[in-house]
Amino acid sequence: MLSKKYRFHSRGGVRFTYAHGKTIRTPKISLVYNENSRGFQRVAVVVSKKVEKSAVKRNRIRRRVYEAIRAEFEHAPKKHDFIFVVYSKDVATMDFAELCTLVNSLFSQSVI
């Protein structure tokens, strides 16, 4: 899990990022990102009830994505806010290396 410093603390930042951010979409996960003035990255992972009804399974997906983000965090651009929105329950069972590759590719596309 990422340190609390690198996570969103309130809904205001998430709403601002949704409203003013740019989106990169893949079939399983999309990334909404926006530049911030804090000097470090902030990250949130969103898994809706449409993806998985069970809260236990949604939290498992969220923990896996946070762990993949933590593994690839040094490749993330500085001074940006990131919201990962999960669209597929396949993320719960996909290979962790594949998930890390997906997160890394989203980070690299956000730099361009």
Walk through the language-model features, giving the residues of each.
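Positively charged, solvent-exposed patches that mediate nucleic-acid binding
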Residues: 1-112
